[in-house]
Amino acid sequence: MKLHLLKSKIHNARVTSGDLEYEGSITIDQELLLLAEMIPNEKVLVVNNNNGERFETYIINGEPGSRVIQLNGAAARCALPGDEIIIMTFAVMDEKKARTFQPMVLIVDHLNNPKRRHRIGQEDEQLSSSI
């Protein structure tokens, strides 16, 4: 049996901008992607904490250090700049692997600077905002 599990998430991210004319996706600062163990073109589920909206899209690499979280295309209608969102990726694995897998959680501040990260079930790793 194959199960769909949380692979990683960026928690407390703030939308920095939107571009309705772009074909679609979410642009995320490359440094945040690396810390959260996410990759370009990966499918994401985004939850808007301000209005409850949930939507799927895919990741585009943003400029490293920019702290950009930009919604593009139709997704730009799902959240406004300043809205707090959670960005999640998922993986498919067999039940044996799923029982021991520990997702990566990256927590950012209100400016999308990385604060800390951890694998669920493990201690936080404090991060410097100068990453």
UniProtKB/Swiss-Prot annotation:
Signal peptide feature range: none
Cofactors required: pyruvate
Main subcellular localisation: cytoplasm
Entry-linked Gene3D superfamilies: 2.40.40.20
GO MF annotation terms: aspartate 1-decarboxylase activity
Cofactor descriptive note: Binds 1 pyruvoyl group covalently per subunit.
Catalytic reaction annotation: L-aspartate + H(+) = beta-alanine + CO2
EC number: 4.1.1.11
Pyruvic acid (Ser): modified positions: S25
GO cellular component, one term: cytosol
Post-translational modification: Is synthesized initially as an inactive proenzyme, which is activated by self-cleavage at a specific serine bond to produce a beta-subunit with a hydroxyl group at its C-terminus and an alpha-subunit with a pyruvoyl group at its N-terminus.
Keywords, sorted A to Z: Autocatalytic cleavage, Cytoplasm, Decarboxylase, Lyase, Pantothenate biosynthesis, Pyruvate, Schiff base, Zymogen
Localization: Cytoplasm
GO BP: alanine biosynthetic process; pantothenate biosynthetic process
Residues the entry annotates as binding substrate: T57, G73, A74, A75
Pfam annotation, one family: Asp_decarbox
Pathway the protein takes part in: Cofactor biosynthesis; (R)-pantothenate biosynthesis; beta-alanine from L-aspartate: step 1/1
Catalytic residues (positions): S25 (schiff-base intermediate with substrate), Y58 (proton donor)
Organism superkingdom: Bacteria
Annotated InterPro entries: Asp_de-COase-like_dom_sf (IPR009010), Asp_decarbox (IPR003190)
Record's function text: Catalyzes the pyruvoyl-dependent decarboxylation of aspartate to produce beta-alanine.
Family under the similarity heading: Belongs to the PanD family.
Quaternary state and interactors: Heterooctamer of four alpha and four beta subunits.
Xref: NCBIfam families: panD
Protein name (Swiss-Prot/TrEMBL): Aspartate 1-decarboxylase
Species per Swiss-Prot/TrEMBL record: Chlorobium phaeobacteroides (strain DSM 266 / SMG 266 / 2430)
